[in-house]
């Protein structure tokens, strides 16, 4: 199973993204790709914030991901574990969200995380293979 990070999801759905082709390929070619519902919220936030995609289009793009990959909700235990791991690893600020994704990937037995930001995951997921498209 392969966990896809938010950056891959954004690049995969946004045709004007400079890495659209490789992100789309990562989504289509990964063995059993999946993500969590929080990554969908981050995708919508990134599309409407950084890329200024209108909310209606951003919602359609984000929700269309459910047809392409498996999406699972995070459990309270995922948040609790991620916070404990963030504390033990010295993770602060927005790195908490990468810790949350890594915790989820670990719980769901992902063998890989595909991301456009490998340095974000090397610290929070040293036990999982980190790939870039």
Question: What positions do the PLM features span?
Answer:
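Internal alpha/beta domain cores that form substrate/cofactor-binding pockets in large enzymes
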Residues: 63-64, 74, 89, 93, ...
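Active-site neighborhoods of divalent-metal-dependent phosphate/nucleic-acid chemistry enzymes
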Residues: 70-116
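Acidic, PIN/NYN-like endoribonuclease modules and their adjacent C-terminal/linker elements
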Residues: 1, 102-133
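A generic structural signal for short hydrophobic patches within well-formed alpha-helices
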Residues: 9-10, 40, 121
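Short, well-structured N-terminal submotif of metal-dependent ribonuclease cores
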Residues: 1-35, 50-60
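Histidine- and aromatic-rich ligand-binding microenvironments
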Residues: 5, 35-36, 94-95, 117, ...
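Helix-adjacent hinge/juxtasegments
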Residues: 53-58, 66-68, 72
């Amino acid at each position: 199973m392969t966990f896809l990070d938010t950056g891959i999801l954004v690049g995969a759905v946004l045709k004007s993204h400079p890495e659209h082709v490789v992100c789309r390929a990562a989504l289509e070619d990964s063995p059993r790709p999946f993500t969590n519902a929080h990554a969908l919220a981050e995708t919508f936030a990134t599309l409407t914030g950084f890329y200024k995609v209108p909310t209606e289009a951003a919602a359609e793009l984000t929700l269309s991901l459910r047809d392409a990959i498996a999406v699972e909700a995070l459990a309270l235990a995922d948040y609790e574990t991620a916070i404990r791991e963030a504390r033990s690893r010295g993770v602060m600020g927005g790195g908490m969200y990468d810790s949350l994704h890594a915790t989820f990937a670990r719980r769901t037995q992902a063998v890989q995380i595909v991301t456009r930001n490998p340095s974000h995951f090397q610290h929070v997921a040293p036990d999982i293979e980190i790939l870039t498209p």
